[in-house]
Amino acid sequence: MRFLYPTFTVEKYDAYLTEMIPHNYKQIAVFEQDVCVGISGLWSGTKLWSGKYMEIDNFIVHPDHRKKGVGKMMTDYVDAKAKETGCTMIVLDAFTENFTAHRFYYNQGYVPKGFHFLKIINKEGLS
């Protein structure tokens, strides 16, 4: 997590997971010799406009392991899981300035569809 959110503490991570897991949140990870080199959260749900969907949340590959197939392995797993569970689509967010992620997602078949708008209510509470 520290590569995406450098100030994120283990305590905050644990507290968030405790809150998220009861709401259909799962995580997948890739390990190399007991070291986590890739991790992502997954949500699934149903929306009126899409039906059942799967959402990738906080997709992170350790910088030393990028361009080695770890991200592809993870998206392939998500693709298979989404098909297996009857989802119509997979969705995700990427920070607007994260051009490396944009290129990766384009290469995996993802396309931008609209904008993700947000309104900050409590800036201090952000990760």
Task: Enumerate the language-model features and the residues they cover.
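Conserved GNAT acetyl-CoA-binding A-motif
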Residues: 75, 82-94
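Terminal substrate-recognition subdomain of acyl/acetyltransferases
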Residues: 83, 111, 115-127
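Acetyl-CoA-dependent GNAT
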Residues: 1-51, 120-121
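A conserved beta-turn-beta hairpin within the catalytic core of GNAT-like acetyltransferases
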Residues: 45-56, 66, 112-113
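Conserved acetyl-CoA-binding loop-helix of GNAT-fold acetyltransferases
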Residues: 61, 67-80, 103, 107
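Hydrophobic adenine-recognition pocket in adenosine-nucleotide-binding enzymes
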Residues: 59-61, 94
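Conserved acetyl-CoA-binding loop of GNAT-fold acetyltransferases
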Residues: 87, 96, 105-115
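Conserved beta-strand-loop-alpha-helix junction that forms the acyl-donor binding cleft
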Residues: 91-101, 118-120
